Every structure is written in C-alpha cells, then in structure tokens.
Amino acid sequence: MNNLVAEPTSVASTQGIRVTVRSVYLPDQSSPDDNRYVFAYTVAIANEGTDPAQLRTRHWIITDGNGSIDEVKGPGVVGETPRLAPGQSFQYTSGCVLTTAVGTMHGSYQMYRDDGERFDAVIAPFTLAAEIASGDRLMN
C-alpha cells in the first residue's frame, strides 16, 4: 500500500471539534500465523469551539494491506452519544481486527449543534501496523 500514513496517530479539527486518535498493536491477542492482527485505538474528541455539539453517528473506513475496504456506520460510539459543551472532551478505546499486518483507518463523526445544525467532524487517517520483535513497525 502506498498511501499508508507514517504514524499511528492522527489529529483533525472541524468546526471546533478536535479528534485525536492513537493506535496500538495487540500482539497477545493476535495470531499472525492465522492472519489475525488485533489493534486497539483510543479516540479523544474535544470541543474547542464556542457551541455545544453532540456526536450522533460514526463512519469508519478501514483499509487493509491488500487494499480491501470495510465501512462501519452506526449510532454513537461504544454505546454512547456524548454531548460536549465548550471545553469538554470525551475519550474511548475500541478495537479492529485485520487479516494483514498493516492497514489504515479514517472517517467522520456526525455532530449536531443545539440549533439543529449538522456537520461531519473529520477523523484523519492513521496507521494500523503490527510490530516485529525488534519493535520496528512493519511496512510494505
């Protein structure tokens, strides 16, 4: 894959909503011999704007090392639809299983303002990359 970002971290801001993501490889839950690579990612969503906003839906685009794409859409995150007042933040951790040692994720959260305005808060691309024994990340 030529379009992998170099870091397992991403940051994006949209209309005062900052989304920061960091991914980690979970070797104890993975089984490379079975093409099973497990990753966790932690997302921090911060309202740096002047108006409250509520996260209503998520849209993830997950691309594995072979270029196969999986889209995930649904209400909220980890069973919640957090409403963030100015200065507030929300953090959660979730996971992803790939059949390749590398991949990427990106997407958006649909946010609603109190006045009914809707916008998509961008989740910038970040890398999912298994680590070899030396701790170096695998890259194609």
Give the positions of each predicted feature:
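Short, conserved beta-strand element in jelly-roll/cupin
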Residues: 40-44
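Asparagine-centered strand-capping/turn motif at beta-strand->loop junctions
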Residues: 45-49
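Membrane engagement elements in two modes
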Residues: 1-38, 50-56, 63-140
